[in-house]
Amino acid sequence: MADDGHDQPRAAAAVYRGFIDAVNRKDLDAAEGFVDPERYRENCVGFTRGFVRWDAAKESIRRVWKGIPDLHVELPQILADESVVLAHGTVTGTATGRLYGAPATRRGCEANFFDFVRVDNGRIIERVQQADVLSQMRQFYGKGLGTVGLTAMFWRLLPRVARHPVPRAVAGG
């Protein structure tokens, strides 16, 4: 797919790699050079409440950096066509700060993720990331607490109404 002799597929993969390289450097200004801020939307499953725009995506990664300041992404596999990039990556880091309210454990982690990225006119316009969040939480907080941490993480993503349903009237009462 990416190495079929056409410039556009390599360009799409290069745009994505450039974006990830900027994120690895914690340079969101440089990362913005690889996205179309007006059209960009991202769903980082488990970390954002569905699709968010570029400003909210930047805030989300800043929150992650507070908990995992040495966050680093490796991209061992990337496939691309004219406008889509699919990537399998590995993220590593150490929980030395608060991560979404959870305390620092000073434990490291290595977890896999998959990215689906759409590129238009040399800029990223959409990104969907699915990370192995359960593995991350277990490595950071241990088996039992990792599951609790994962539950708490997803709990905060639920809309307030879903977390506090209105009691139903008792029939015949």
Describe the residue ranges of each PLM region:
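C-terminal and inter-domain tail/linker signature
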Residues: 1-173
